[in-house]
Curated annotation (Swiss-Prot):
GO molecular function (one): structural constituent of ribosome
Family the entry assigns: Belongs to the bacterial ribosomal protein bS16 family.
Entry keyword ATP-binding: no
Protein name: Small ribosomal subunit protein bS16c
This protein's GO CC annotations: chloroplast; small ribosomal subunit
Pfam families: Ribosomal_S16
Subcellular location: Plastid, Chloroplast
Top-rank taxon: Eukaryota
Length: 79
């Protein structure tokens, strides 16, 4: 099952995340199927490729709870 989830990168104590599509059984920093954005919780900077996200969600990809909240804040998902 494919999931839309966060992949950590950055330095120690300075996390930054990429929004990626990957198998649910793949480890957190494993190889993604596709990268659709990024999020930096320290600077609150984020970018989401709306076209790719909508495409993957239409294919049935499930976002994790954290990613769902991020997309809801950026008005990409309506409840």
């Amino acid at each position: 099952m494919l999931k839309l989830r966060l992949k950590r990168n950055g330095r120690k104590r300075q996390p930054a995340y990429r929004l990626v599509i990957m198998e649910s059984t793949t480890r957190r920093n494993g190889r993604p199927v596709d990268e659709v954005g990024y999020y930096n919780p320290i600077t609150k900077e984020s970018y989401f490729n709306k076209e790719k996200i909508v495409k993957w969600l239409s294919y049935g990809v499930q976002p994790t709870e954290t990613v769902f909240q991020l997309l809801k804040k950026s008005n990409l998902i309506e409840i």
